[in-house]
Amino acid sequence: MAVPESKAALLEEMEKSALSLRKKLSRIPAEIAYQECLEGHVTGSRMSVANLVSYLIGWGEQVLYWHHQEAAGEEVNFPAKGFKWNELGKLAQKYYADYQHITSWPMLLVMLEENQQQLVALVNGFSDDELYHQPWYGKWTRGRMIQFNSVSPYRNASARLNVLLKALTAA
């Protein structure tokens, strides 16, 4: 799994990571989805699979918001307004809270799917040059920032779900 270096490679990795994640999430029973059965994003904390999905939606929305801010000529808040890069655990907890009112597991999965489709549409709106041949945030290209906050967390989530699914199968 090499780091994407082109628009086509990014779109391919986005699709592959989303498909893998979707397959694993489809195996999570609704009655388990809201139980704190995973290691959280903050050391020593626990989270539910629903929290994990909320985290993914939150990051996806954040990426979309960065681009909304940029298009509006506003200063882009990286990683998010009121948060620093060394406070990502707190930001994860904010994302859990942002979606805690969604108590329907199927609805949360639909929201994740819609968010992923919006990210694909975002990428499709840029040329390869705009994504990978000019810095966007410091030394990072736009494509790399999108990959950091979509493909990478999807892969991490899939790995977490593998552990849970093995435990559920063994039980």
Segments from the language model and where they lie:
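A short small-residue
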Residues: 1-2, 39, 91-100, 136
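Extreme N-terminal tail/first-helix region
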Residues: 1-24
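Hydrophobic packing residues in well-ordered alpha-helices of helical domains and bundles
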Residues: 7, 11-14, 49, 105-112, ...
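Solvent-exposed, charged/polar functional surfaces in cytosolic regulatory/catalytic domains
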Residues: 20, 24, 118, 122, ...
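Active-site flanking loop/helix segments enriched in acidic
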Residues: 32-38
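Short, contiguous alpha-helical
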Residues: 38-90, 125, 130-171
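Acidic/histidine-rich alpha-helical segments that form the ligand environment
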Residues: 84-130
